[in-house]
Amino acid sequence: MILLSLYLCLAAMLHQSEGEASPKLPGLMTSNPDQQTEITDKHNNLRRIVEPTASNMLKMTWSNKIAQNAQRSANQCTLEHTSKEERTIDGVECGENLFFSSAPYTWSYAIQNWFDERKYFRFNYGPTAQNVMIGHYTQVVWYRSYELGCAIAYCPDQPTYKYYQVCQYCPGGNIRSRKYTPYSIGPPCGDCPDACDNGLCTNPCKQNDVYNNCPDLKKQVGCGHPIMKDCMATCKCLTEIK
């Protein structure tokens, strides 16, 4: 039997069906601690081997809250991305990768497929060919995404792709202003020498900036200005990765 797989940034609209249990799913359900470990370790191992090397790549950790949100997305069986509002968790907009298949695949396989888009990606340039996808790769290696949660659903009413795997990443990557520079080039942990775990930084800034120009605003008006209430990362995180 030919196994079909599809991993898209923008999926074609298909008939909706409610996600339900499948006899083949229990081993892949992310309520299982071993699956959480596999998913998190796979992401971190791939983040360690980016080329060129990253000086500010954060280590990812598992979030049950994000996983629950990803499960809600998977259970819809729409085979398309959720809205920005549906991916906003505790005020933080998160990213999302999708993997559709006609038979169940391991999480490591799905994540590796996302990462393998790197063959079409050139740092600070973008896609190296037309009509190729790179957004899954850049999200997997987005330096500031440090929490993730994933989920799988079985969608029996879908004609082809009945297995639907979703990972969500917070904060989300693929920011338009730097989507082709998903991290800073430099020696591993170059930006976090005192908070490093085998090439990955362990000191994420847990504050967020609303504006892209917060560093410039800080220089102009200082953190005491009322407008800077929307620049908490710039003002509060002095040594953390932000």
Swiss-Prot record:
Principal subcellular localisation of the protein: secreted
Alphabetical list of Pfam families matching this protein: CAP (PF00188), Crisp (PF08562)
Keyword Nucleotidyltransferase: no
SCP domain sequence ranges: 41-169
Compartments it resides in: Secreted
Disulfide bridge partners, by residue number: C77-C155, C94-C170, C150-C167, C189-C196, C192-C201, C205-C237, C214-C231, C223-C235
Tissue-wise expression: Expressed by the venom gland.
Keywords: Calcium channel impairing toxin, Disulfide bond, Ion channel impairing toxin, Neurotoxin, Potassium channel impairing toxin, Ryanodine-sensitive calcium-release channel impairing toxin, Secreted, Signal, Toxin, Voltage-gated calcium channel impairing toxin, Voltage-gated potassium channel impairing toxin
Domain annotation ShKT: ranges: 205-237
Signal peptide (residue range): 1-19
Family listed: Belongs to the CRISP family.
The name this protein goes by in its record: Cysteine-rich venom protein helothermine
Taxonomic source organism: Heloderma horridum horridum (Mexican beaded lizard)
